[in-house]
């Protein structure tokens, strides 16, 4: 938020989205390397011409990787309309997404969710990307409270090793792999009990 205030007179929303994607992409590849010079160029803390070239190049590569991931993943999403009107979408990112590459499971789940929100325009949508011991949640127009859901899952499945959190409508949950089925089933029950908002 501080960076946005710093540059709001220079960049529009779309430019900032490109900078964010370039940072996300580069941070994935620089996990164990500080990459300070490159990050400074992405944030335009140096030369504007270098910033533009780097951001454009990284966004092009990131978008190509996202497109490739979604070509593999979208056909494997299972969608269910719940009695409360929510369209619940689940994707096994362990088995139906490329591993060890960009985008990672959380970003993949978010990109899948964004496309499903367009597909199910005007409807409440929840997307769960899950792996052997985690689930990533995204939602639109669903009255969820992920930190509260995590707390309840911890109490209801004490041997599940449940932890996690996030915001009200975006978050992640970790659990022990042997309890995945139980945790995901309880999570689906909780989503089915959520209220919904009008999609504007």
Regions found by a protein language model. Give the residues of each.
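Glycine-rich, acidic loop segments that terminate in or are immediately followed by a histidine
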Residues: 1-2, 6, 10-21, 53-200
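A conserved active-site cap/scaffold subdomain adjacent to cofactor or substrate pockets
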Residues: 3, 7-47
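Charged, low-complexity intrinsically disordered tails and linkers
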Residues: 39, 48-57
